[in-house]
C-alpha cells in the first residue's frame, strides 16, 4: 500500500507539472489594441491575439477618440481571471468584465490570466460591418 501511495503521489506531481503552462511569477506579457488611427476611424492595430492558459497578460486598449468604441467579448471575459483594470491611472479590482466602452480618447489596461482554452471572438458594437472584429485564441 505504501508503494502505491508513493507512486500515486509522484504521478500526481508529474501530471501537475505537465499540465501547467504558465508561471505567474514571470512579468505579464503586453498585448496592444489600438482603435482608430489618423487615417481611419475604423482601423484596429491587431485583430488576432494568441495566448496560453495560466500565463499573465496585460492588454492595453487605446482609442484615438474619433468614435465611441464598445468592445464586446463576453465569452472571453467569462474565461479569464481578472487581476485588475486600470483606467487613466486609477486601478480597479473587479471580478467580472461585461464590456469595455471608450467614449473618448483614452486608454484602459486589463491585467488578466486566461483560464480556459478556446477561440473567442470580439467585436466593436455597431462597427462590425466596418471590419472591427477580432479573435482571442487561448491555447
Per-region residue spans from a language model:
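Sec-dependent signal peptide recognition
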Residues: 3-10
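N-terminal signal peptide c-region/cleavage motif recognized by signal peptidases
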Residues: 15-17
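N-terminal edge beta-strand
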Residues: 23-58
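Beta-strand cores of secreted/periplasmic/IMS beta-sandwich domains, seen most often
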Residues: 46-75, 108-115, 121
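Soluble periplasmic/extracytoplasmic beta-strand elements of cell-envelope proteins
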Residues: 32-34, 58-60, 123, 135-137
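Short aromatic-acidic-glycine turn motif
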Residues: 77-88
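Short beta-strand and strand-turn-strand segments in soluble, beta-rich domains
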Residues: 41, 87-95
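Extracellular/periplasmic metallocenter environments
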Residues: 21-27, 43, 95-139
Amino acid at each position: 500500500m505504501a508503494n502505491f501511495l508513493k507512486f500515486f503521489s509522484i504521478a500526481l506531481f508529474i501530471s501537475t507539472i505537465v499540465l501547467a503552462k504558465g508561471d505567474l511569477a514571470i512579468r505579464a506579457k503586453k498585448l496592444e489594441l489600438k482603435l482608430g488611427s489618423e487615417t481611419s476611424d475604423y482601423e484596429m492595430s491587431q485583430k488576432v491575439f494568441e495566448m496560453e492558459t495560466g500565463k499573465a497578460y496585460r492588454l492595453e486598449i487605446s482609442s484615438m477618440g474619433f468614435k465611441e468604441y464598445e468592445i464586446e467579448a463576453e465569452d472571453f471575459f467569462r474565461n479569464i481571471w481578472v487581476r485588475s483594470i486600470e483606467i487613466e491611472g486609477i486601478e480597479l479590482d473587479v471580478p467580472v468584465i461585461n464590456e469595455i466602452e471608450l467614449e473618448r480618447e483614452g486608454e484602459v489596461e486589463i491585467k488578466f490570466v486566461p483560464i480556459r482554452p478556446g477561440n473567442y471572438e470580439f467585436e466593436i458594437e455597431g462597427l462590425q460591418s466596418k471590419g472591427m472584429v477580432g479573435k482571442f485564441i487561448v491555447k
